[in-house]
C-alpha cells in the first residue's frame, strides 16, 4: 500500500534554502581543533604507527616501482631535464638563464634533512612536498622549483617518483655546469601524506605569535650551554641548528655575524648529518660554486609559506609583493648576491675568492647580514637578470667560517691547491648526501647506480660465494642448535637483538652481516646476554661448514636468526600450538673492516622496550621524553603496526627476552612458553599496579585482596594496559579464544622483523635489480 508524504511537514523535510544544521552557526568539521592533541597533549600517539599506510597510497600494494622505472629511457629522461634546466618561464624566470643552481638547492634541501641519530629525514620519500618541511623558512621557493618540474613529472608519470626526480634534477644541474657526478641511483618511493611523527625540535610557531617566532629563532630550547663552551651541545636527535633551517643560520648563531661561532655550529650540525670535516667543506664550497642567494625584499613583507597560503595559490607560498615578485625582485633567505664571477660554471672561484680577499660585513637590501670584499678591484658578478649590470661578490658568515676555523681552513687549502681533489671530494660527498638514507645497494635502480665501490657509509656486505642450504640442511642445523642446550630465552633474545637494530628510516641495521658479533654491537650493555649464544652458534657453524664438498655453507648471521626460529617453534609447541616459523637463508657475515664504528654506535639504543632495557644514564639525562615514547619510536623504526608492536612485546615477555634475563614484565609462571599470560595478567581486574620507585619507572603487580606482590614490571610493560588503544589490542589476546591467534600473529610479526633488512630477497619488499 503506497503512502502519501506531506512535503509541507517540516518534521520530515527542511524548508527550501534552510541550513540542514540546527541553529545558525557551524563551529567545525572533521579534523578541526581542538582534537586529542589539544585536550591531552601528553597522550601516547600510537596512531603514528599507521601513517603513510596503504590507505593513503593511490598506486596500491601491487604497484612495482622498480619494474616501472626500468621502462624509462633513462638517457631521454636526462635530456628532458637538461633541456628544461637551460630554459626560462615568465612566471618564475631562471637566474642567468639556468635553473641549475636553483634545482641543486632543491635537491640539497630535500636530502639535507637527514640526521644520523635516528636516520629520519633525507630525500628518500620526497617529504619536501609536505608540511612541515615544505613550509620551513629555509625552503623558501623550493615550491617553485618543484612546480617547474611538474611537466616532466607528468610526462613520466608514476614510473618516476618525485623523490627520485628531485635528486636526479640536482645531478643533471651539476653536470650541465661542468661537474662530473659520481653517480645516481633511483629507487626512492614517494610518501603520500605528511610526516606527522618526526620530532623536529621543541619550538612551536603559530602564525601571528611574536613570542613563538622568537622561540624559534633564539635557539635556546634546543641548545645547551654557550657557543664555545665545553658543554655547548645540540639536543638529540636533532641536527639542524634552528627550527625551520636545514643546517645553520647563514648569518651566524643568533644572526651574530661571528664566523668562528658559525664554524662550531656547522661542525656539530654536519656531524649530526653524518658528514666529516672534509665532506662538510666539499659540500659547502661545492654548492656555493653555483648560483646566488636572494634578498631583495624584507622578510616581513613576504607572504605565508605554502601550508598557510590562500587556496587560490594552489600550494605555492611566500608571495613577494615587490615588482614581479620573481627575477630581479626575488626574496628567499634575505642574503643577496653570488659567490663567484661565473655562477653557472664548476670552478674553484669560490675558494679562490674566499682566501684571496679580506671581507667586511654589510647588509643586503632585505637587511640580512653578509660580507663583501674590502678590495674595490675585486672581481664582480653579473646580475642574474639584467644584462650588463654587475655586483660585488658576496660571502655569508657561514662561508667566512671555513676560513677562520683552523681545521676547516686546512681542508680548504688542500682543495684550493688541488682542484681535482676538490672535484672528486664534492662529487662523492654529493652522492653520499643524496643517497645516505637509501640503505643497501640492493635497493638501487638505474644505469648510473654505483654498485661496485665499497663505500663504508653504505654498510657494505661481502658477496656470497657459496651455495645456500636447503630444507634438509636447515632441519639438521635446527637439531644441532637444539643440541647446544641453549635456552629458548637466550636464542630468542639473541635473534631479536640482531634483527631489531634495523631502522626503516635509513634502512640501516638488521641481522644481515652478522654485526652482532662485531664491535661496537658486541660490546653494548644491552647485548651482553648474546655473547655466549654467539660463541655456541659459531661452533655449530664451524662443524657444519668444515669439510663439506657440496659447496653449501651457513653464515653466523643466518644461524642467529635460525636459532630464534628454533626457540619460537619450541615455545609455541609447549603452549600447545604446532607451527613452523619461516626462515629464509642468504644472510652473509661481514667484517670489522667493513663496519664503521662511529656510525654504528648511533644505532645503540638508549631505551629498548622490547628487551626491557633502559640505559643507566637515561635517568640522569635532561629529557622531556618517557621510556614508552622511546619504545613507540623504536616500534616505528621497525615499521610495526600497533597490533604487531603489542603481540611482539607480549611474546618476548613470555619468552623472557629481557636484556638482563630479569623477570620484570615476565608476567607468567611458564617462562619460555608462548602463552598469553602477559596480556591476561596485565588486564586482570583482580590485580592492581603500584609504583615500586619514586620516579615511577618500575611497578609491582599485587593481588587486590591479599596485597601480595605477584610480578614486577616497567613502563614499557604497563603501557599496554594503560593506553586505551594498546589495551584494546591486549584484550583481543587475553580472552579465552586468544591463544592460537596470538601465536599466529606473533610468528608473523617475528618473521617480519627478521626479514626487514633482506633487500636481497626478490619479491619480499620493493627492491632493486640486485635482488636475487
Swiss-Prot record:
GO BP term, example: cellular response to hydrogen peroxide
Cofactor: how bound: Binds 1 heme b (iron(II)-protoporphyrin IX) group per dimer.
Cross-link (Tryptophyl-tyrosyl-methioninium (Tyr-Met) (with W-108)): 247-273
Domain of life (superkingdom): Bacteria
Enzyme Commission code(s) on record: 1.11.1.21
Assembly description: Homodimer or homotetramer.
Full protein name: Catalase-peroxidase
Classification of source organism: Bacteria, Pseudomonadati, Pseudomonadota, Alphaproteobacteria, Hyphomicrobiales
Amino acid at each position: 500500500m503506497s503512502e502519501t508524504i506531506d512535503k509541507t511537514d517540516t518534521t520530515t523535510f527542511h524548508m527550501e534554502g534552510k541550513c540542514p544544521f540546527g541553529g545558525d552557526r557551524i563551529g567545525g568539521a572533521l579534523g578541526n581543533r581542538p582534537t586529542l592533541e589539544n585536550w591531552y597533549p601528553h597522550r601516547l600517539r600510537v596512531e603514528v604507527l599507521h601513517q603513510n599506510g596503504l590507505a593513503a597510497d593511490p598506486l596500491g600494494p601491487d604497484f612495482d616501482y622498480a619494474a616501472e622505472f626500468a621502462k624509462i629511457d633513462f638517457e631521454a629522461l636526462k635530456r628532458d631535464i637538461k633541456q628544461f634546466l637551460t630554459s626560462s618561464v615568465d612566471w618564475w624566470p631562471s637566474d642567468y638563464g639556468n635553473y641549475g643552481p636553483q634545482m641543486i638547492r632543491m635537491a640539497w634541501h630535500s636530502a639535507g634533512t637527514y640526521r644520523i641519530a635516528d636516520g629520519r629525514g633525507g630525500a628518500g620519500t620526497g617529504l619536501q612536498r609536505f608540511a612541515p618541511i615544505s613550509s620551513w623558512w629555509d625552503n623558501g621557493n623550493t615550491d617553485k622549483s618543484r612546480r617547474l618540474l611538474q611537466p616532466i613529472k607528468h610526462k613520466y608519470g608514476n614510473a618516476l617518483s618525485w623523490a627520485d626526480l628531485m635528486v636526479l634534477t640536482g645531478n643533471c644541474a651539476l653536470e650541465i655546469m661542468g661537474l662530473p657526478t659520481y653517480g645516481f641511483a633511483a629507487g626512492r618511493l614517494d610518501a603520500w601524506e605528511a610526516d606527522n611523527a618526526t620530532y623536529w625540535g621543541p619550538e612551536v610557531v603559530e602564525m601571528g605569535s611574536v613570542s613563538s617566532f622568537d622561540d624559534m629563532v633564539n635557539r635556546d630550547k634546543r641548545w645547551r650551554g654557550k657557543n664555545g663552551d665545553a658543554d655547548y651541545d645540540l639536543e638529540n636527535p636533532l641536527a639542524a641548528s634552528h627550527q625551520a633551517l636545514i643546517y645553520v643560520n647563514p648569518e651566524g648563531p643568533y644572526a651574530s655575524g661571528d664566523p668562528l661561532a658559525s664554524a662550531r655550529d656547522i661542525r656539530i650540525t654536519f656531524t649530526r648529518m653524518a658528514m666529516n670535516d672534509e665532506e662538510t667543506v666539499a659540500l659547502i664550497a661545492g654548492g656555493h660554486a653555483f648560483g646566488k642567494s636572494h634578498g631583495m625584499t624584507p622578510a616581513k613583507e613576504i607572504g605565508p609559506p605554502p601550508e598557510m597560503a590562500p587556496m587560490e595559490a594552489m600550494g605555492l607560498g611566500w608571495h613577494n609583493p615587490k615588482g614581479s615578485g620573481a627575477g630581479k625582485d626575488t626574496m628567499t633567505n634575505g642574503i643577496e648576491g653570488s659567490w663567484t664571477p661565473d655562477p653557472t660554471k664548476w670552478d674553484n672561484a669560490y675558494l679562490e675568492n674566499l682566501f684571496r680577499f679580506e671581507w667586511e660585513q654589510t647588509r643586503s637590501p632585505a637587511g640580512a647580514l653578509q660580507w663583501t670584499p674590502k678590495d674595490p678591484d675585486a672581481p664582480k658578478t653579473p646580475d642574474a637578470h639584467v644584462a650588463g649590470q654587475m655586483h660585488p661578490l658576496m660571502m655569508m658568515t657561514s662561508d667566512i667560517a671555513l676560513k677562520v676555523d683552523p681545521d676547516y681552513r686546512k681542508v680548504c687549502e688542500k682543495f684550493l691547491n688541488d682542484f681535482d681533489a676538490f672535484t672528486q671530494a664534492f662529487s662523492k660527498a654529493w652522492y653520499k648526501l643524496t643517497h645516505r638514507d637509501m640503505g643497501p645497494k640492493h635497493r638501487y635502480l638505474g644505469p648510473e647506480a654505483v654498485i661496485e665501490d665499497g663505500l663504508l657509509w653504505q654498510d657494505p656486505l661481502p658477496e656470497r660465494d657459496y651455495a645456500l642450504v636447503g630444507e634438509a640442511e636447515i632441519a639438521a642445523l635446527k637439531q644441532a642448535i637444539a643440541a647446544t642446550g641453549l635456552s629458548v630465552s637466550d636464542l630468542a633474545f639473541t635473534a631479536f637483538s640482531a634483527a631489531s637494530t634495523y631502522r626503516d628510516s635509513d634502512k640501516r641495521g638488521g641481522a644481515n652481516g652478522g654485526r652482532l658479533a662485531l664491535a661496537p654491537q658486541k660490546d653494548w650493555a644491552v647485548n651482553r646476554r648474546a655473547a655466549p649464544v654467539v660463541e655456541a652458534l659459531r661452533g655449530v657453524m664451524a662443524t657444519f661448514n668444515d669439510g663439506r664438498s657440496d659447496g653449501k655453507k651457513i653464515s653466523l648471521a643466518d644461524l642467529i636468526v635460525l636459532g630464534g626460529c628454533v626457540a619460537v617453534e619450541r615455545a609455541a609447541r609447549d603452549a600447545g600450538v604446532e607451527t613452523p616459523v619461516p626462515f629464509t637463508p642468504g644472510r652473509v657475515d661481514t667484517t670489522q673492516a667493513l663496519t664503521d664504528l662511529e656510525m654504528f654506535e648511533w644505532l645503540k639504543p638508549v631505551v629498548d622496550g622490547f628487551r626491557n632495557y633502559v640505559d643507566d644514564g637515561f635517568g640522569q639525562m635532561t629529557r622531556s621524553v618517557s621510556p614508552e615514547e622511546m619504545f613507540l619510536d623504536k616500534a616505528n623504526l621497525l615499521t610495526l603496526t600497533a597490533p604487531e608492536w603489542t603481540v611482539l612485546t607480549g611474546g618476548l615477555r613470555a619468552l623472557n627476552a629481557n636484556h638482563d634475563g630479569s623477570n620484570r614484565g615476565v608476567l607468567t609462571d611458564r617462562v619460555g612458553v608462548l602463552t598469553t599470560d602477559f596480556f591476561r595478567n596485565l588486564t586482570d581486574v583482580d590485580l592492581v599496579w603500584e609504583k615500586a620507585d619514586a620516579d615511577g619507572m618500575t611497578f609491582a603487580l599485587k593481588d587486590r585482596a591479599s596485597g601480595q606482590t605477584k610480578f614486577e614490571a616497567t613502563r614499557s610493560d604497563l603501557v599496554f594496559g594503560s593506553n586505551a588503544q594498546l589495551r584494546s589490542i591486549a584484550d583481543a589476546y587475553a580472552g579465552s579464544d586468544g591463544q592460537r591467534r596470538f601465536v599466529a600473529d606473533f610468528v608473523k610479526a617475528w618473521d617480519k622483523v627478521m626479514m626487514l633488512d633482506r633487500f636481497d630477497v626478490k619479491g619480499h619488499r620493493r627492491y632493486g635489480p640486485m635482488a636475487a
